[in-house]
Amino acid sequence: MFQFHAGSWESWCCCCLIPADRPWDRGQHWQLEMADTRSVHETRFEAAVKVIQSLPKNGSFQPTNEMMLKFYSFYKQATEGPCKLSRPGFWDPIGRYKWDAWSSLGDMTKEEAMIAYVEEMKKIIETMPMTEKVEELLRVIGPFYEIVEDKKSGRSSDITSVRLEKISKCLEDLGNVLTSTPNAKTVNGKAESSDSGAESEEEEAQEEVKGAEQSDNDKKMMKKSADHKNLEVIVTNGYDKDGFVQDIQNDIHASSSLNGRSTEEVKPIDENLGQTGKSAVCIHQDINDDHVEDVTGIQHLTSDSDSEVYCDSMEQFGQEESLDSFTSNNGPFQYYLGGHSSQPMENSGFREDIQVPPGNGNIGNMQVVAVEGKGEVKHGGEDGRNNSGAPHREKRGGETDEFSNVRRGRGHRMQHLSEGTKGRQVGSGGDGERWGSDRGSRGSLNEQIALVLMRLQEDMQNVLQRLQKLETLTALQAKSSTSTLQTAPQPTSQRPSWWPFEMSPGVLTFAIIWPFIAQWLVYLYYQRRRRKLN
């Protein structure tokens, strides 16, 4: 083998020194080329054999028996030629398998066996761990996967181009979303940035709910407000249902738009209101969630944090808003129109549901004052309570509950009060819930608490009874054990009171007499022995 390499090296030197185009050297040059090709197959074969021989017995790659038989047969065919040995006996089954694999190759030449050995190695080289021998084999073999890559290059390029196009489209969409102007909410002169995901869903729901966008023109705004924003005055009276409606003019301005699309002003809407009596007046106005009205004077916008009960769930974003809800359980209200508190109007009988068309004229501030602490003023998401003499809760601007605050309540609709129901509370709460009777709810809650306390008390009594039983049982057991110990027969001491020693007199006498008895027994034994000898 080494001679073959030396010959190939000499032939390579000769090829470099002697020109190949001479006619007298063509046969020698052909022989040298054959030697070079044979040397390549041989070097590859040697590298593959080194890889197989370097595999550890307990390594990660474990070839199968069939694979090892193939490598064995190709190796024997490449090194020794065709099989000329006799088949081993039955006592050597492994040798018989090897002989069968080797002899199955027949008259295959050594070069073909080397090539077949290397080809089999190419099939498993990817699953083998990367070692120095494997690196050497790969360097000798060269890039044998180049043809496979050329066949699939067109298809892979098409797939990659399609993927790149999809990725570029996604990036363009993302860039458009990022570069678009963010929505802004303006509440009380302060802008709030809106979340992209939640606000987009909210805007879609709002676009389905509202009919069309409001224009900047005041006349068109008035027409649309007649369709979408009806100002209803709903009056309930538990005592009298007779009365008529007089003109009251309300000036309400839309201060800002919540979604930042447009800032609009709503012209004053005139209302006709009847003569007031002992009843509760509920003013409901259906508006979109995109707008918030400010009532002039002492009325101002309040945030959701002012209310005790509120809800910001996504399901209620698309619902309409109502301006205010003023209810009373059983106490009258006094209304001061135009800011003159010297001219109050007491509640009187009204019709329950009155649709007030817009009229002409304006009024000043409308103040609602609870008389005798019995009235309730509910706003937005706040739920009023009948405090009946309790101190008024201070608001943000230092104002008490005597004045109505207009707040933004999300997701509430027009609520109509029923007549003559005492203790019934109906408010435009932002959480979409309506509380029932305060007394009923408190009563049911008190009953539940009382029931829970009774059950807890019963459980505690049961536990105490069990503890008492256990204590009595343990006490009885302790007493019985002590009594048995006391009643047990104690060993009577045989020692008299005058005896000075610790041991009893009988033990002492036995200890003293025992040596004499032993000596006497020994004496008797020797005496009998002497008699026998004599």
Swiss-Prot record:
Query: What residues does an acyl-CoA bind to?
Result: 52-61, 72-76, 98, 117
Chain's role: Acyl-CoA binding protein which acts as the peroxisome receptor for pexophagy but is dispensable for aggrephagy and nonselective autophagy. Binds medium- and long-chain acyl-CoA esters.
Q: What is its main location?
A: membrane
Which GO molecular function annotation, any one, does this entry have? fatty-acyl-CoA binding
List modified residues, type Phosphoserine: 193-194, 196, 200, 215, 279, 313, 428
Q: Where is the ACB domain?
A: 41-130
Lineage, uppermost ranks: Eukaryota, Metazoa, Chordata, Craniata, Vertebrata
Q: Which disease is it linked to?
A: Retinal dystrophy with leukodystrophy: An autosomal recessive disorder characterized by progressive leukodystrophy associated with developmental delay, spastic paraparesis, ataxia, and retinal dystrophy. Patients may show facial dysmorphism. Laboratory investigations reveal an abnormal profile of very-long chain fatty acid in plasma.
Q: Which SUPFAM superfamilies match?
A: Acyl-CoA binding protein
Residues bearing N6-acetyllysine are 469
Give the protein name, as stated in the record.
Acyl-CoA-binding domain-containing protein 5
Q: Where is the composition biased (Basic and acidic residues)?
A: 207-225, 376-385, 431-441
Q: Which CDD domains match?
A: ACBP (cd00435)
Coiled-coil region(s): 190-219, 447-476
Q: Which family does it belong to?
A: Belongs to the ATG37 family.
Q: Which organism is it from?
A: Homo sapiens (Human)
Q: Which of the residues bear the PTM Phosphothreonine? A: 400
